[in-house]
Amino acid sequence: MSNRRSKARTAALQGLYQWQLMGQDVDKIDIEFIVQDIRGIDHAYFQELLRGVPQRQGELDECLGPFLDRPINEVDPVECAILRIGAFELLCRPEIPYRVVLNEAIELAKRFGAEHGHRYVNGILDKVAQKVRATEFRSRALRRRLQT
């Protein structure tokens, strides 16, 4: 993935964190980022994540729920936002390979999450990916078997 898209994920994480903790309107958050004039990000992708995650929160939380070890509202807010971004990408952006989604989420968790938060994020999103990207998982496993 492009560095611009990685930066968009980082900005979306920050915006979604504000939205989750303070209930701030995503339009206001978007305006804040425009005013800050953050350069080098894929602004359209930032907006897609910033708006798409709240719009589909129920569906995303339902998708994540079976794999969480606690209710979603008890998950660390940073990891929660990362999990929701990852679930959104897995569900809504099938053109992005699941490995890219997982790697980007892990990097966000390493950078912004708790000490071992990246392991938690990886474990949850890996299970979500197996469920929602089953065909992609099977074809990857088949390719690995054929290579050995």
From Swiss-Prot:
It holds the Pfam family NusB. InterPro entries: NusB-like_sf, NusB_fam, NusB_RsmB_TIM44. GO terms for cellular component: cytosol. Keywords: RNA-binding, Transcription, Transcription antitermination, Transcription regulation. It comes from the Bacteria. GO terms for biological process: DNA-templated transcription termination; transcription antitermination. GO terms for molecular function: RNA binding. Signal peptide: none annotated. Involved in transcription antitermination. Required for transcription of ribosomal RNA (rRNA) genes. Binds specifically to the boxA antiterminator sequence of the ribosomal RNA (rrn) operons. NCBIfam families: nusB. Belongs to the NusB family. This is Transcription antitermination protein NusB. It comes from Nitrosococcus oceani (strain ATCC 19707 / BCRC 17464 / JCM 30415 / NCIMB 11848 / C-107). The gene is nusB.
